[in-house]
Amino acid sequence: MRCSVAVRASSIYVKNPQLRKSFLHSNYVQLIQESPNFLILQHNNLLPREAKSLRTELKAKVPGSKLQVIRGSIFHHALKVYESIDRLSNGCVDMQKVNLIETHKKAQKIKLDIDNLFVGPLAIFTLGPKLSPEAIRGFMSVLKGYQNKILLLGIRAESKGMDPFEVENLSKIPSLEFLQSSLLSVLSSPASQLRRILDLSKANVAYTLERREPSE
């Protein structure tokens, strides 16, 4: 079920700075709700034409994802607010509670494992509600052409933070479709071939157990 959509700050111009921050904050909470999995990036003097080119490449490589420049301090607090609000029966955050004083007080007490990343000029790359190693691989391949402009700081994946090294390892995990295809291939193999595979696996297990036995 799709969660309710909040008013987006980008679609409304408000002169009052506090109201603008409030709209932006709500917009970020909604963005996190739509994509709780995202990469955290630091951008360095990225020119408008470079940003446009980067977005075009990412859109082609990872359809459905989005690169968005953020205001780090506001997004950071929005993430804490998102984590502090109890979910509705459909798994969504109650957007009516986002700007309540009680919610903000509760959010201030929350500690995140990526608290130290929200420094400097930042952007996020959304990965959607379901974590996809394939999407991360697509992003990493595009990132190679912007090494001096975009720095990968980490990832927020399934409510946990990971550093760039862990992101690299995560990107190497085979997709679910690949695993399903491999399993189907094995199951559809001739019985004799399947037996050889099982015998080989059994031999490997036996060898491993022998190696682990304490020497007399």
Swiss-Prot record:
InterPro entries: Ribosomal_uL10-like_sf (IPR043141), Ribosomal_uL10_bac_type (IPR047865). The keyword Translocase does not apply. It is found in: Mitochondrion. One of its GO terms (cellular component) is mitochondrial large ribosomal subunit. One of its GO terms (biological process) is mitochondrial translation. The keyword Mitochondrion applies. Its main location: mitochondrion. SUPFAM superfamilies: Ribosomal protein L10-like. Residues 1-9 form a transit peptide. GO terms for molecular function: structural constituent of ribosome. It comes from the Eukaryota. Component of the mitochondrial ribosome (mitoribosome), a dedicated translation machinery responsible for the synthesis of mitochondrial genome-encoded proteins, including at least some of the essential transmembrane subunits of the mitochondrial respiratory chain. The mitoribosomes are attached to the mitochondrial inner membrane and translation products are cotranslationally integrated into the membrane. Component of the mitochondrial large ribosomal subunit (mt-LSU). Mature yeast 74S mitochondrial ribosomes consist of a small (37S) and a large (54S) subunit. The 37S small subunit contains a 15S ribosomal RNA (15S mt-rRNA) and at least 32 different proteins. The 54S large subunit contains a 21S rRNA (21S mt-rRNA) and at least 45 different proteins. Belongs to the universal ribosomal protein uL10 family. This is Large ribosomal subunit protein uL10m. It comes from Schizosaccharomyces pombe (strain 972 / ATCC 24843). The lineage of its organism: Eukaryota, Fungi, Dikarya, Ascomycota, Taphrinomycotina. The gene is mrp11.
